[in-house]
A protein has these predicted regions:
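Alpha/beta enzyme core
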Residues: 2-7, 11, 19, 31-37, ...
Length: 300
C-alpha cells in the first residue's frame, strides 16, 4: 500500500471538492434520468387519479393520466417505466394477469401508441399478487401454500401476454424457483426471443414493501411471503439466486430493497458483469417523505 504519511500539505484532497463543477467532474458515480426506472400504478375502473395515502405524490392512475404522467417524465429525460396493474376483478388464479384486455395490457398498448421503443422502454411487472383475491404471488394448494410449478405456468402466460401487448422488457418479481428459465423458454417459443428479462434475483422479505401493497392493493389475505422471498440475513443465498437467474437466462439482475442491501449489490458486482438494478422501494420513499413532512430532513 502506498505510504501517504508525508503527503500533506502537498496533497490536499479538498482541492477537488471546492465547488460544484469540480465535484461533478470527479464524481465516481453519476446518476442521470436515463439510469432510472419510474414505477407506475394503473388501476382499472377509476375515473381520475387517486393519491396513495402512504406514498405522498404517488398515484393510482387511469389510462389517460398514466399517459400524461409518462409524457412529463419523458420530457424530463426519463427513458423507462415499469407498470403495475390493479384489476377490478380478482380471483384465486389471477386470471386477469394474462387477459389480453387486462389493465396492464391496456396500459402497455396506450403507452406504445404514444412512444416508440427508441423513446421509452416499457417494462411490465410479471407476478400474480395484484391479480389474486388472496394477495399471494402464485397459485395456492389446498393447504394454502404457493404451488411453485403451477405458478410458473401462469407467469409464462402473463409474460407472453404482456410481450404480445408490446412490452419491451419483462420483470418477474414473484421469487418462484425456476421462473426465469420458464419465462425465457415461453417467450422464445412465442417468438419473443429479443425481449429481455429483468430478474428480481435477490428480493428480500421486508416490511418496507408496505406502502407498495397499499398502492397495488395486494397485501396477503393471510400469512406472509417469507416462504418465497429471501431471508434478510442471507448473503450467500443472494449469490446463489443470482447465479441461477443468470444461467436461466436473465439479462438484468436486481437487489430489492436497495438501500439496506448495498453490501449485497457490491457482492453481486464482484461475481457478475450483468447490469444490476437496485430497487428503491416504497417504504424507503415513504420514510423520506414522512421525515421531510415533519421537518426532520430535506425531503426533496
Amino acid at each position: 500500500m502506498t505510504d501517504f504519511s508525508s503527503a500533506f500539505p502537498n496533497l490536499r484532497l479538498r482541492r477537488l471538492r471546492k465547488n460544484p463543477a469540480l465535484r461533478a467532474m470527479f464524481s465516481e458515480v453519476t446518476v442521470n434520468a436515463n439510469d432510472l426506472i419510474l414505477p407506475l400504478f394503473v388501476k382499472e375502473g377509476i375515473l381520475e387519479p387517486k393519491e396513495i395515502i402512504s406514498m405522498p405524490g404517488v398515484f393510482q392512475h387511469t389510462l389517460v393520466s398514466l399517459v400524461e404522467t409518462v409524457k412529463t417524465a419523458v420530457a424530463s429525460g426519463l427513458k423507462s417505466v415499469i407498470l403495475f396493474g390493479i384489476p377490478e376483478h380478482k380471483d384465486p388464479t389471477g386470471s386477469m394477469a394474462d387477459n389480453e384486455n387486462g389493465i396492464v395490457q391496456q396500459a402497455v398498448r396506450a403507452l406504445k401508441k404514444e412512444f416508440s421503443s427508441n423513446e421509452l422502454v416499457v417494462i411490465t411487472d410479471t407476478c400474480l399478487d395484484e391479480f389474486t383475491s388472496h394477495g399471494h404471488c402464485g397459485i395456492l394448494t389446498t393447504e394454502g401454500e404457493v404451488d411453485n410449478d403451477l405458478t410458473l405456468q401462469r407467469y409464462v402466460s402473463a409474460a407472453v401476454s404482456q410481450a404480445t401487448a408490446g412490452a419491451d422488457m419483462i420483470a418477474p418479481s414473484g421469487m418462484m424457483d425456476g421462473q426465469i428459465q420458464a419465462i425465457r423458454a415461453g417467450l422464445d417459443e412465442a417468438g419473443f426471443n429479443e425481449i429481455p428479462i429483468m430478474a428480481y434475483s435477490a428480493k428480500y422479505a421486508s416490511a418496507l414493501y408496505g406502502p407498495f401493497r397499499d398502492a397495488a392493493e395486494c397485501a396477503p389475505e393471510f400469512g406472509d411471503r417469507k416462504s418465497y422471498q429471501m431471508q434478510p440475513s442471507n448473503v450467500r443465498e443472494a449469490r446463489l439466486e443470482t447465479f441461477l437467474d443468470i444461467i436461466e437466462g436473465a439479462d438484468i439482475v436486481m437487489v430489492k430493497p436497495a438501500v439496506a442491501y448495498l453490501d449485497v449489490i457490491a457482492e453481486l458486482r464482484q461475481m457478475c458483469d450483468l447490469p444490476i438494478a437496485a430497487y428503491h422501494v416504497s417504504g424507503e420513499y415513504s420514510m423520506v417523505k414522512a421525515a421531510g413532512a415533519n421537518g426532520w430532513i430535506d425531503g426533496d
